Amino acid sequence: MAVTARNQRVAEEMKKEIARIIRDEVKDPRLEAGLVSVTGVELSNDRHYAKVYVSIYGDEEARNQAMEGLARATSFIRREIGQRLSLRYTPEITFKLDVSIEHGDHINRLLARVRAGEYADE
């Protein structure tokens, strides 16, 4: 499945608009528990489906609450995307938790511990 230039442009525009909608228009208190960032959008080749990857800063409870809030707001966000972007078909949106930032942070902490000598051979 090759990613076309058109799909890349649409995905980038969707990413920007979804971030704006979540930040400015979704009034769900569950989204205020953790800082929500849209990290990427992956479109199917026919542009009928979109996976929206989000990173949520906060503890496990804040992440769960924010994901519930996003699930509840999905139809509103999809409707807004349909009005803002001139697409033939507004994709069905699925939110996915992106843990790559936390994973990278964990690796950085491990590397810092190795540099500090915590894992030196005895």
From Swiss-Prot:
The keyword Cytoplasm applies. Coiled coil: none annotated. GO terms for cellular component: cytosol. It is found in: Cytoplasm. Keywords: Cytoplasm, Ribosome biogenesis. One of its GO terms (biological process) is maturation of SSU-rRNA. Monomer. Binds 30S ribosomal subunits, but not 50S ribosomal subunits or 70S ribosomes. Belongs to the RbfA family. This is Ribosome-binding factor A. The lineage of its organism: Bacteria, Bacillati, Bacillota, Clostridia, Moorellales.
